[in-house]
Design a protein with these regions (language model features):
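Positively charged n-region of N-terminal signal peptides that target proteins for export
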Residues: 1-5, 19
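Bacterial N-terminal signal peptides
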Residues: 5-14
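Bacterial Sec-dependent N-terminal signal peptides
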Residues: 14-32
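The feature marks the mature, well-folded catalytic cores of soluble enzymes
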Residues: 26-378
Length: 378
């Protein structure tokens, strides 16, 4: 084989490798799947229970009460699918729930190894196909772009969490739609209004640490094909601001098809949302071109202090709530504004009861209620 032949083969191999992802991009805007809006009727909710095997016993114990509270609120109207690391953890969780007088009738346990608790980002995405069959999509999870642990200086490991969608699909006998080679996308990076509009920050999607070289047009084509969304509200976001590169669901979500739930401008600025993004958010339009109504919820009055007395140095957001069948689980912080926020959010859901969930210790690790829940529609 001469040098010229080797050179040509090398060029061809490189060309094919570089274009693999482009070949897999949707070439049309045909809608193959539609994601039910979060507030539609649930079969259940998925939780990945904290354990000791990645971050230790103190981490696990600090988060247990939040998971017990969420389970207690959810079991009254839907299944709670609890992912336990192993049988020892399952037995421990059952003991915790029994101690808290949580009935186990609606609790379903799965034993899967996990790395952490963020099922919104790594968990199954349930969608309906053209025949109205419920299937599971696996969008891949690489730890928000292969992030480095600040304390250890090592790559954060999420190989176990990345397998959760396929394990659930196998156990449930559901079709798995593997989107890993097309796009990497966390559940918390997108919110949808239930009427064809998706809102997201570019920083957590059009980022080389997830989707190298992907354009906005390509991302929109994927979201149209696989989630059924045709109208897009893009904020720039800020790459590197925190571990997620600024997920949208921390500061802006859809309350319903006509309402965006967010904060006043000063609170958004305090929450590190850029002024240019605030302007885009407030100017957002529905699929039909009309404006949304805005429901604005304040930040906490004070900086969040964990249950062990650690002052985090920043305020808490109430936007990252979760809508269950007959409850709305709202992050709470032992703050005077808990009651204010709960009351404001309650006005949007008159047929559901708002339940405050203490997330102070979870918030220290970057998340709230929506981040650690994942709905399974009927």
């Amino acid at each position: 084989m001469n040098i010229m032949t080797i050179l040509l083969m090398t060029i061809l191999t490189t060309f094919l490798a570089c274009n693999k992802s482009e070949e897999q991009m949707p070439t049309t805007t045909e809608i193959l799947y539609t994601m039910p809006e979060e507030s539609e009727a649930h079969e259940g909710t998925w939780l990945q229970w904290p354990h000791q095997y990645q971050y230790g016993v103190a981490y696990r114990n600090s988060l247990d009460p939040t998971w017990v509270s969420m389970t207690k609120a959810l079991v009254t109207s839907e299944k709670v699918h609890i992912i336990a690391y192993n049988q020892i953890e399952k037995d421990r969780i059952i003991s915790l729930l029994n101690t808290a007088s949580v009935p186990l009738t609606n609790v379903d346990f799965k034993i899967y190894k996990t790395d952490d608790v963020w099922v919104r980002d790594n968990g199954p995405i349930y969608v309906k196909d053209k025949n109205n069959n419920l299937v599971i999509q696996d969008w891949g999870f690489n730890g928000w772009g292969n992030k480095i642990d600040d304390q250890t200086g090592l790559l954060i490991q999420f190989a176990n969490c990345n397998l959760i969608p396929s394990k659930i699909a196998t156990d449930q006998g559901k079709t798995i739609i593997d989107i890993n080679s097309i796009m990497t996308n966390e559940g918390g990076s997108v919110v949808m209004d239930g009427n064809g509009t998706l809102m997201a920050c570019k920083s957590s999607i059009l980022n080389n640490n997830r989707n190298p070289g992907m354009t906005q047009a390509q991302a929109e084509a994927i979201f149209t094909k696989y989630l059924g969304q045709t109208n897009f509200i893009w904020l720039d976001g800020q790459a590197g601001l925190e571990v997620t590169d600024q997920h949208i669901d921390g500061f802006a979500i859809f309350g319903d098809q006509n309402t965006i739930v967010t904060m006043e401008q000063n609170d958004l600025l305090d929450y590190d949302v850029k002024q240019s993004d605030i302007n885009k958010l407030y100017a957002a339009k529905k699929k039909d071109g009309t404006a949304y109504t805005f429901l604005k919820v304040p930040l906490t009055q004070n900086n969040v202090v964990t249950t062990n007395g650690t002052n985090l140095g920043y305020k808490g957001s109430y936007i990252n709530y979760y809508i269950a069948n007959n409850k709305v689980l709202v992050p709470n912080y032992n703050d005077p504004n808990d009651a204010v926020a709960n009351g404001i959010i309650q006005t949007l859901y008159p047929t559901r009861t708002v339940v405050g969930i203490d997330v102070r210790n979870l918030y220290e690790n970057g998340g709230m209620v929506h981040c650690v829940t994942q709905q399974q529609p009927l």
